[in-house]
Amino acid sequence: MNSDIVEVATIGRCVGLKGYLKLHNKSDFPEQFKKGATFFDKNDDQLIIKDYNRQKELVLFEKFDDLDLAKTLVNKTIYTTKELTRKNCKLKKDEFFQFDIIGLKVVENGEILGIVEDIQDNFANSLLYIKTDEVLIAAGKPKNFYIPYLERFIESVNLDSGEILVKGARDILENS
């Protein structure tokens, strides 16, 4: 799949007789789900929201507004693009889209520790999954490790230079 694509939700079971579906949001931006918003599935079929109930997380798509048609969407994953995400989702100061963080170099005191390969969210905070730099792997360090996305470990994120400056992450690597 195209690297410009962002997974945003999975469509769940039908609710009621009018074609409403349970929407399992996988993004941090529920505001993107609104009347008229356009998404697509893995076959590039367009899905336009006709109605959305944020409290109940129920969605009704245009052209799928009866039970039989809606059933064809159950268990589908829906996507958007990075461009549309940037347009429709507003970030606060010092916030970043996960897709912008993935692929950045992790640097501590001038040493490249690795590259962010994934981000895992848990109840407490996000964890950066780091693929350890080949030089460190050759020196006997683990192939990967996690860094909590917390102020005490993250000094700065610079998208222009493609780096996350960290502190204390080398200790995490050493003890992984």
UniProtKB/Swiss-Prot annotation:
Which Gene3D superfamilies does its entry note?
A: PRC-barrel domain (2.30.30.240), RimM (2.40.30.60)
Q: Does the keyword Nucleus apply?
A: no
Q: Which UniProt keywords apply?
A: Chaperone, Cytoplasm, Ribosome biogenesis, rRNA processing
Gene Ontology MF annotations: ribosome binding
Membrane-spanning residues: none
Extract the InterPro entries matched here: PRC_barrel-like_sf, PRC_RimM, RimM, RimM_N, RimM_N_sf, Transl_B-barrel_sf
**Where is this protein found?**
Cytoplasm
UniProt xrefs under Pfam families: PRC_RimM, RimM
Q: What does the record list as GO biological process? A: ribosomal small subunit biogenesis; rRNA processing
Kindly list the GO CC terms recorded for this protein.
Answer: cytoplasm; ribosome
Q: Where is the PRC barrel domain?
A: 93-172
> From which domain of life does this come?
Bacteria
Q: Which family does it belong to?
A: Belongs to the RimM family.
Cite the record's note on assembly.
Answer: Binds ribosomal protein uS19.
Question: What's the stated role of this polypeptide?
Answer: An accessory protein needed during the final step in the assembly of 30S ribosomal subunit, possibly for assembly of the head region. Essential for efficient processing of 16S rRNA. May be needed both before and after RbfA during the maturation of 16S rRNA. It has affinity for free ribosomal 30S subunits but not for 70S ribosomes.
User: What does the record's free text say on domains?
Assistant: The PRC barrel domain binds ribosomal protein uS19.
The protein's name in its UniProt record? Ribosome maturation factor RimM
Upper lineage is: Bacteria, Pseudomonadati, Campylobacterota, Epsilonproteobacteria, Campylobacterales
The gene name on file is rimM
